[in-house]
Amino acid sequence: MIDVCNMQQIKLLLAKYGFHFSKSKGQNFLNQRWVPEQIVQGSQIDKDCGVIEIGPGFGPLTQELCKAAGKVVALELDTTLKPVLAETVGEFDNLEIIFTDAMKVDLPALVEEKFQDLRPAACANLPYYITSPVLTKLLESKCFSSVTVMVQKEVAQRICAKAGAGDYSSFTVLCNYYGEPELLFDVPAHCFIPQPKVTSAVVRLKIRKDPPAEILDEGMFFRTVRAAFAQRRKTLLNCLSASFGEFGKEELTRIMESVGLAPSIRGETLDIPQFAALSNALLQAKEGK
């Protein structure tokens, strides 16, 4: 098996296939074997798992996933990698590579088709520019037991942030609504070719079987969260007033106070149970109109 984390092997592959890294696709490939090994270990992947991998690149993580998992389905956008992957991971009979845009894939249908008797998990080294939409799609698909991603460290910290922290955001709430995130380890820039300008980090999200709070309507919940973070320096009352035109400020004040929230509070200080209580109260008030 070709060691695609060996710089000499990487250079040979680059020369053999005339491959050029694409900045527009955010291609930064791993060149250190310990990284994919630790990702698989931290992901808790075993032979009972079926894994969707997004963006295999040259296949270093794919190799480790195939060793550990029952089956791996890798989704790759760049068709110029087809001959490279045939050489680097072609020997694995538990691997299927689909050349497609992961953002256009019906993930629940794919998981149902490929992993009928396996516990589905997702694993990805995500390009920085598409981290949020891909991770959101993985979580909203509600078809995985866990999702493990390598992202920019700043994004990893945002995913794991606590209410009131400077990096707490609507994306934090979304990630924690669907899963329980754990920051596994950092990955220095020198572990990639070409080297990015930032440090990366690996985060594992154990997907929740049930929401962390009672929520009457997901749409209203996330509408409330988006409104709360739309203007970080404004009070929650002003943020809600700007986004919920169907309510006057006096009515919004009464709704907030009914769930124990002062009108002067800022949205970024609310945790998920508080957002749940507020969104439920807003929904009930709207339905009562």
Q: Model-predicted segments: where are they?
A:
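Catalytic cores of RNA-modifying enzymes
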Residues: 1-227, 254-257, 266-268, 277, ...
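Conserved catalytic loop of SAM-dependent methyltransferase domains
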Residues: 230
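Short helix-coil junctions and helix-kink-helix linkers
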Residues: 241-246
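Short amphipathic alpha-helix in the helical subdomain of ABC transporter nucleotide-binding domains
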Residues: 249-252
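Primarily EF-hand calcium-binding motifs
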Residues: 259-261
